[in-house]
């Protein structure tokens, strides 16, 4: 399954992330948080069963023109069940982690448009189609 979401912030906050040193690399820490979140989804969500994981990938795309970061998480499991809940959990944990590290620079940070892009595994599954037509990606 593949999910993504955005975090919008001030130009100062985004520059802090771009210029962050390796010891305090905001996106690396957010990536670790998201991967840890994959393993904890069944503990965080009532009635959600643990999924044995095969693959977790966390990517970030920085758009300096609009001071926004897109987080994309792809999760595959060893079971036949999909990993949609894990992917959505991970995206939000990555965004919250970024928020937590730059909130002292910008108190108007907005996390938005967290959604599922692909359901199922990488070889088969349903692509998200924005049926409602009211979301601007």
Q: Where are the language model's segments positioned?
A:
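C-terminal binding/interaction regions
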Residues: 1-49, 55-137
